[in-house]
Swiss-Prot record:
One of its GO terms (biological process) is microtubule-based process. It comes from the Eukaryota. Mg(2+) binds at residue 69. Dimer of alpha and beta chains. A typical microtubule is a hollow water-filled tube with an outer diameter of 25 nm and an inner diameter of 15 nM. Alpha-beta heterodimers associate head-to-tail to form protofilaments running lengthwise along the microtubule wall with the beta-tubulin subunit facing the microtubule plus end conferring a structural polarity. Microtubules usually have 13 protofilaments but different protofilament numbers can be found in some organisms and specialized cells. SUPFAM superfamilies: Tubulin C-terminal domain-like, Tubulin nucleotide-binding domain-like. This is Tubulin beta chain. Disulfide bonds: none annotated. GO terms for molecular function: GTP binding; GTPase activity; metal ion binding; structural constituent of cytoskeleton.
């Protein structure tokens, strides 16, 4: 089977990751101890992608849990699904990274990385035909950002031909945890551009907006945000976990979604987004799902797709839905909003349908877009970075761990290059496209 090894690093990465395992265990009929209690053969047909079948019919996640301090790990162990994970796959330090990217990447993280890679290799060896890795982490902290990107480069070194996909939580000024987030995020994006194959950008600001506006929550906590992220992760990985045709592995998804290797940062969305407790009172049609899914208010990334253009889009519908309805609705969206799709990639919207609906819903749709409007998000981080870096504010925390100012300048210019690449393709017409293809 085409296995995927899941790595979660840092506090945010571990919390989001655990929610993901809770969600997909529910969908595959796996209980909290790893026993199968489901009812459908489809649940087991591709279970080996994410789970290893151990002795006595216990299903164990192919997950490695990493942190530079023991607190989050203890919380995971004591949580509802703590017994699901293999005890040897918890790898943690004692010192923490103190929200410092340099500690995660160069000092504390570098000391722990060999033990992490040993576990990763062991998981890879127990795979039959490994397709790749997925990482959940945040870009604003020390461990998820610094050590997460160190892990990324080590995996790229050891497994050069496997796919690496990241679910990266991007910091936002409205929901700020630390003042040095713009530094940590810019240094991380510098690494993601070079080493990741696919990055789903999840944005705390957008998640909070969804909680307030759509779900009508007065005081959303991280639990609510992580629930939203797990909906998207479950939707995005549906094609990998259940029998289906389109985008059935990480590489096919990448081939459909990434026209230029550096532009692999995706916006994700989900429909229906409904307040908890109201799902029983409403059924949705395919057209409502499609409209919601393309609505910027449903995007988990704080950028407005109407301000840019879509290079490519993938949509995953779930539930008892006719393929014909889906195709009709999707082509309607495209013809109504034709100016939002670049015309030089002819069939740039791909659709998949999976019979198995997510738990508690009759049908759902997950949206993945490669849109040039994501430059808003990079621009926001880059502007904050520049303001601080010009004054060299807080730099001593990084140089004290052995980093060089040069590395900051390189990360800044890589970010600026990325912005201008997105802008170039946003403005491009069919005539220009012929030039790209010639180059």
């Amino acid at each position: 089977m085409r296995e995927i090894i899941h790595l979660q690093t840092g506090q945010c990465g571990n919390q989001v990751g655990c929610k993901f395992w809770e969600t997909i265990s529910g969908e595959h009929g796996i209980d909290q101890t790893g026993r199968y209690v489901g009812t459908s053969d489809n649940q087991l047909e591709r279970i080996n992608v994410y789970y290893n079948e151990a002795s006595s019919k216990k299903y164990v996640p192919r997950a490695v849990l990493i942190d530079l301090e023991p607190g989050t790990m203890d919380a995971v162990r004591q949580g509802p699904f703590g017994e699901l994970f293999r005890p040897d796959n918890f790898v943690f330090g004692q010192s923490g990274a103190g929200n410092n990217w340099a500690k995660g990447h160069y000092t504390e993280g570098a000391e722990l990385i060999d033990s992490v890679m040993d576990v990763v290799r062991k998981e890879a060896e127990s795979s039959d035909c490994l397709q790749g890795f997925q990482i959940t982490h945040s870009l604003g902290g020390g461990t998820g950002a610094g050590m997460g990107t160190l892990l990324l480069s080590k995996i790229r070194e050891d497994f050069p031909d496997r796919m690496i996909c990241t679910f990266s939580v991007v910091p936002s000024p409205k929901v700020s945890d630390t003042v040095v987030e713009p530094y940590n995020a810019t240094l991380s994006i510098h690494q993601l551009v070079e080493n990741a194959d696919e990055t789903f950008c999840i944005d705390n600001e957008a998640l909070y907006d969804i909680c307030f506006r759509t779900l009508k929550l007065n005081n959303p906590g991280y639990g609510d945000l992580n629930h939203l992220v797990s909906l998207v992760m479950s939707g995005v990985t549906t094609c990998l976990r259940f029998p289906g045709q389109l985008n059935a592995d990480l590489r096919k998804l990448a081939v459909n979604m990434i026209p230029f290797p550096r532009l692999h940062f995706f916006v994700a969305g989900f429909a229906p987004l409904i307040a908890i407790g109201t799902q029983k009172f409403k059924t949705y049609s395919v057209s409502e799902l499609t409209q919601q899914m393309f609505d910027s208010k449903n995007m988990m990334t704080a950028c407005d797709p109407r301000k840019g253009r879509y290079l490519t889009v993938a949509a995953m519908f779930r539930g008892k839905i006719s393929m014909k309805d889906v195709d009709e609705q999707m082509s309607m969206v495209q013809s109504k909003n034709s100016s939002l799709f670049v015309e030089w990639i002819p069939s740039n919207v791909k659709t998949a349908v999976c019979d198995i609906a997510p738990t508690g819903l009759e049908m759902s749709a997950t949206f993945v877009g490669n849109t040039t409007s994501i430059q808003e998000l990079f621009k926001r981080i880059s502007d904050q970075f520049t303001v601080m870096f010009r004054r060299k504010a807080f730099l001593h925390w990084y140089t004290g761990e052995g980093m060089d100012e040069m590395e900051f300048s390189e990360a800044e210019s890589n970010m600026n290059d990325l912005l201008s690449e997105y802008q170039q393709y946003q403005d491009a017409t069919i005539e220009d496209a012929e030039e790209f293809l010639v180059n």
